[in-house]
Regions:
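Ligand-binding cleft/hinge of the Venus flytrap
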Residues: 19-24, 36-45, 124-142, 148, ...
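A ligand-binding cleft/hinge motif common to bilobed small-molecule-binding domains
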Residues: 56-59, 73-81, 127-130, 157-192
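Ligand-binding clefts/hinges and TM-proximal coupling segments of bilobed small-molecule sensing domains
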Residues: 46, 123-139, 180-181, 212-239
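Extended ligand-binding regions for polar small-molecule ligands
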Residues: 33-42, 102, 110, 115, ...
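Extracytoplasmic small-molecule ligand-binding "clamshell" domains
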Residues: 4-72, 81, 221, 230, ...
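Periplasmic-binding protein-like
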Residues: 13-14, 91-98, 171-212, 232-239
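Short helices/loops that flank or line small-molecule/ion binding pockets
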Residues: 37-42, 50-51, 55-67, 82-84, ...
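A conserved helix-loop-strand patch within extracytoplasmic ligand-binding domains
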Residues: 45-48, 73-74, 87-133
Length: 239
């Protein structure tokens, strides 16, 4: 009998703390890495984490270089034209962070004439292009952290990202010194999606069912909460 190859789980090669980033030894660590390990164990799937450049991660999936994506990828109608998704495994708000005391608000009127930083090829870029592009300049970055660095240095006025990534930045020395959250943007499910799920090739229904069952298991048996506790003060599973 042929031995089944391990499933290659694609994560973004660009660090995205606290979800996935390399430690000093080059090992990938973070909440999403822990969840990958737990979901694969729950589904009795042998998995290997495979870093891929974010902009090429969907082509890597459809081209067969990886078997699944677990990289904080939001379930959106646009992406579902190309790939399929499991049930969601987290859903957090999209938030804007600015310099302390900026007086800005997380809407088009509040962003008028400002420069907003977003990570390229994300729902945050899509949202900013749809809702803020008439009022503000949108600047894209390869990583969320690069945008945060420019914000801290005063080169941009605001950065839009997932609330968890922003919380991690605001807990850092640089974030504490410079910046504050001005709150969540108005929801737009067409752009922001229905939460984050496992990206899969279309037609792989058996693998999708395996992931859905494994996600349900870690949610039900307390593993999800145990993994989350060291990283987050409240559940990020969402509505």
């Amino acid at each position: 009998m042929a031995v089944a190859e391990p499933l290659k789980i694609g994560i973004a090669a660009e660090p995205y703390p606290p979800f996935a980033s390399p430690d000093a030894s080059g090992n990938w660590v973070g909440w999403e890495v822990d969840l990958i390990n737990a979901v694969c164990a729950a589904g009795e799937m042998e998995c290997v984490i495979t870093p891929v450049a974010w902009e090429g991660i969907i082509p890597s999936l459809t081209g067969g270089q990886i078997d699944a994506i677990m990289a904080s990828m939001s379930i959106t109608a646009e992406r579902m034209q190309t790939i399929d998704f499991s049930d969601k495994y987290y859903n957090t708000p999209t938030v804007i962070v600015t310099a302390k005391g900026s007086g800005l608000t997380p809407d088009a009127a509040g962003m008028a004439g400002k420069i907003i930083g977003v990570q390229v090829s994300t729902v945050h870029e899509a949202y900013a292009q749809k809702h803020f592009t008439d009022a503000a300049e949108i600047k894209t970055y390869q990583t969320t952290d690069e945008g945060f660095q420019d914000l801290a240095a005063g080169r941009i006025d605001a950065s839009q990202a997932d609330s968890i990534a922003i919380d991690a930045f605001l807990a850092s020395d640089a974030g504490k010194a410079c910046c504050e959250s001005i709150g969540a943007v108005a929801d737009d499910k067409d752009v922001l999606g229905l939460g984050v799920g496992v990206g899969l090739r279309k037609g792989e229904d058996e693998l999708k069912a395996k992931f859905n069952a494994a996600i349900a298991k870690v949610l039900a048996d307390g593993t999800y909460d145990a993994i989350s506790k060291p990283y987050f003060s409240a559940s990020i599973y969402g509505d």
